[in-house]
Amino acid sequence: GLNILQLCINFPCPIIFAVLTAELLSDKFKKTVQTVTFFPYFISWAAFGGIFINLLDYDTNIFNTLLYQAGILKEKVNVLGDPDYFWGIIITTSLIKGMGWGSIIYVAAIAAIPQELYEAAKIDGANRWHKIRYITLPSIAPTITLFFILSVSGILNNGIDHLLVFQNRSNISKSEVLDTFIYKYGTKDPWYRWSYTSAVGLMKSLVSLVLLISSNFICKKVTGKGIY
């Protein structure tokens, strides 16, 4: 469930972000926004996650405290310990950390679009929405298709360092996925069952290959574009 939800949210957000920054912001402000959003990507999950753990901690959560003191909450919420909040934490932090970096390729694809197309559209009376719909999105469609296929094929990869930072005994019911299972069973289990975890990893790779071929086939049928 977490894998599918991450794909549905984390895949389109960098595209939307790239299109909005390219079409709606001035060049000076655009560079500032891109720099600010790129920066979190270069921070390790240990440090980045530690910041959010301190922000969301039961005792130090400032938003929790303010809402409780204002009477909006009857009692403080243990965000890190409640399994129902775990998926939201993972998706939100992955967006903040990776959206700027994930939008780079789309920004580059938009920059490669001939400006004459936009100038001709402006002469014909096209507004910004028309330019985005009829010029920008069709022009970057091959790039979107490529990354969609790669994202679908990698849907089983959650990012183990990301999950382990926020995982605890209270949210284990929502935070335990295939990657964390392989890691724990292969390295922390007293018997070090490497052969078993290697087999699980191989099956995971085979599933990813099937997803890659299937998603490429579907994209070629629907859009006429694929990776081969």
Enumerate the predicted regions with their spans.
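A structural signal for multi-pass alpha-helical bundles of membrane permease subunits
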Residues: 1-228
